[in-house]
From Swiss-Prot:
Protein name: UPF0291 protein OB1671
Gene3D superfamilies (UniProt xref): Helix hairpin bin
Location(s), subcellular: Cytoplasm
Cellular component GO terms held in the UniProt record: cytoplasm
Organism: Oceanobacillus iheyensis (strain DSM 14371 / CIP 107618 / JCM 11309 / KCTC 3954 / HTE831)
Compositional bias segments (type: Basic and acidic residues): 57-77
């Protein structure tokens, strides 16, 4: 998870970008922070997917094979 300080900095840079523009250094910092944020979001999403089971109205497991394969590859022992 990204620290509150980093999230706050992302928001400050975004606001400044809209209001007055960013310096070259600030643009580089913003890009780095955004990449770190997206990496974190993707990782969290993948962790959530690894625990999902899809059930039909009758209670049968209908989890797509592609998701089952992903879960099998990423099981924690």
């Amino acid at each position: 998870m990204l620290s509150k300080d980093k999230l706050d900095r992302i928001n400050v840079l975004s606001k400044k970008s809209k209001e007055e523009g960013l310096t070259t250094e600030e643009k580089a910092e913003q890009k780095k922070l955004r990449e770190e944020y997206l990496k974190n979001v993707r990782s969290s999403f993948k962790n959530q997917l690894s625990t999902v089971t899809v059930l039909d109205p009758e209670g049968k497991d209908v989890t797509p094979q592609k998701l089952r394969d992903y879960q099998d590859r990423n099981k924690k022992h």
